Amino acid sequence: MSDEALIRLAEAAGLSIDWIDADNREQRVEPAVLREVLACLGLAAETDADIDASLEILAHKNNHGGVPPLLTCDQHAALDLSAYFPAASRFELQAEDGGVQQGTLDYQARLPAIDAPGYYRLTIDKHQLTVAIAPLSCPTVAQIAGADAWGLTAQLYSLRRAGDGGLGDTQALESMVSNAAAHGADALGISPVHAMFSAHINQYSPYSPSSRLFFNVLHAAPGAILGERPLRQAIETCGLGEELERLERLDLIDWPAVAQSRQRLLRQLFDDFSKGGNPLQVDFDSFRANGGEALENHCRFEVLHTHLRNAQGHTQHWSDWPSEYRDPASPAVDAFAREHADEVSYHAFGQWLMARGLERAQVAARSAGMRIGLISDLAVGADGGGSQAWSRQAELLASLSVGAPPDIMNRDGQNWGISAFSPWGLQQNGFRAYIEMLRANLAHAGGMRIDHVLGLKRLWVVPAGADPKRGVYLNFPFDDMLRLLCLEAWRHQAVILGEDLGTIPHGLRDVLAARGILGMRVLLFEQHDGHFQTPAQYPAQALATSTTHDIPTLTGWWRGHDIDWRIKVGQVPESDRDAQWRAREKERAGLNRALCEYSGKNPDVLLSAEDAVDAAICFLAHTPAPLVLVPVEDALGLEEQTNMPGIVETHPNWRRRYPGDSATLLDSPASSRRLASFAQARRNHRGAAHR
């Protein structure tokens, strides 16, 4: 078998044979890796005959079986339909408001330009399809929030309030947005709130969800929706008072214990609610009806996943279930759902509480004066064994895992254990799964952060369980996905932030910026060999921030606390401690020089950690970034970081809680001073820039 034939198949399948790594070196994927990934895509490539057969499969997939269910186009641009219809074909175009336009395609078989963004129903020669007309750009921060916008980022699970039972919830989030707004913030970015597995309580990373279409019900605050009296009664009935108080006192979240107690409590609340007579029943019924098939399938999955355990009591991947349950549309699944209708309704009840809680938090944010409000966080993928993969099997690739090639931060690469969309599945199904995901994550927010925004164009995919180095980039229908993102952002009047760190293809940042999608610049990364960029060197097409959840806090970095942690967990040998410290001292001296103008201190003297945090936040205020986001950890001067990538057991990832009640979290003298100085500097700098 020739490598030439293999490469032809790989390229036809959307795989990038050649790529540029983080060190700007050209790389080529090994033939063996290509064959492994192609096999996971259902394309055999062991022999020339295999390749010929696989090319025929691709030809059929790419043909979509005729006219595709959805096409995208920019507003003010003609849509080329020559691949599907002859010139001068008669058409009828129906807008979402019911308005109808009739006409003929031009001599090049193009549909005349449409000015108004939206979804249109196009009929030609008895064929019907949807045409998505996208605005040229997402709403910009300047359009939504003005010229001096800034906000904070917080981990939802870390928030505290009296009676929270050991985990941050939407009621604490309401208090947090009010507290942040009181200090002048326009936005609060939060960690992902995607649905997890109710039957797999040890999986709690918010970036490894069961579904990005629904919510983690453990963050629901039922008392805020149903009332405190029903909540107290349910706690008493369950005998959970002492346990909830114990969990609330912990410094680190005990996720399994929290999940057990909250699920018991939610079930009791549902049972009480279901007795009838609750005026909120109408709202719940409406929510469930509007959720449609997607909500029903998620709830059915949760019940099936709980019931279908193996002999050892471990939950199973849905692909290992009895065959009659692997298809969500099967008669067996319908029968199971009818038999367990009460349990299915219970899971819908939890989703209702979460949706209403997030809605309340966004209303509270805007009412308190935030111009953007909540910024949701969209994880790059979902667990291949989860409800989204089960219910959207034609649109997700469950046999491949998303990750990242070796780069500056992770020299061994990364395998995130989550599945990606199928490029062909999306196109063949009218991008249904993608659109519904965008809508779910924009429904209760004024903005959305897209984790690893590179995934709109390409994703590093690895066979499940394989070494992350043995992967390849899989390309996606980028233009279509970008247009749909712009359209949904426009419909929701939301700003879009794209996390563009790591290995980025040349020119991608410019394309995203032209579409109004803000990139991200992190203070600790904006340097070369200890020489940090000045605020003026930051781009005006990206947000600026001090740190992220995957790297040290400013205080922790300044003190070298992260070095101690890396040695403690075995990422770095003890013998490298001195070298690590020397490198850090060089970088710290460079940042100290960069901050001297904003510290008011002698530039020849090393700043204290507290003064460095003050100066760093003031530094960010002077960048031309249209939006600056300050992590709550840095606003408070905390030392510990949220997550250490690649570490599971030896560092408390996703378990840390903030030191005070959300209603007053930012009101300490140090954080109040820090935020007041930052807000004033932001106003002054942006005002000067526009004079």
Predicted regions and their residues:
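Acidic/aromatic-lined carbohydrate-recognition and catalytic surfaces
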Residues: G42-H76, D80, P86, Q94-L105, ...
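Short, well-ordered coil/turn segments that N-cap beta-strands
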Residues: D148-W150, G184-D186, A368-I372, H444-G446, ...
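Hydrophobic faces of well-ordered beta-strands that scaffold small-molecule active sites
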Residues: W150-A154, L188-I190, I372-S376, M448, ...
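Active-site-proximal loop/turn and secondary-structure-junction residues that shape catalytic pockets
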Residues: S158, H194, L378-G384, L454-L456, ...
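Active-site-adjacent "subsite" loops/lids of carbohydrate-active enzymes
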Residues: V217-L218, G384-R432
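Conserved alpha/beta catalytic core and glycan-binding cleft of carbohydrate-active enzymes
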Residues: D271, L280-D283, D500-E639
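Active-site-proximal helices and loops of the catalytic beta/alpha 8
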Residues: Q362-V363, G381, G385-I408, V462-K568
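Low-complexity, glycine/alanine/valine/leucine- and proline-rich hydrophobic stretches
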Residues: L636-S668, S672
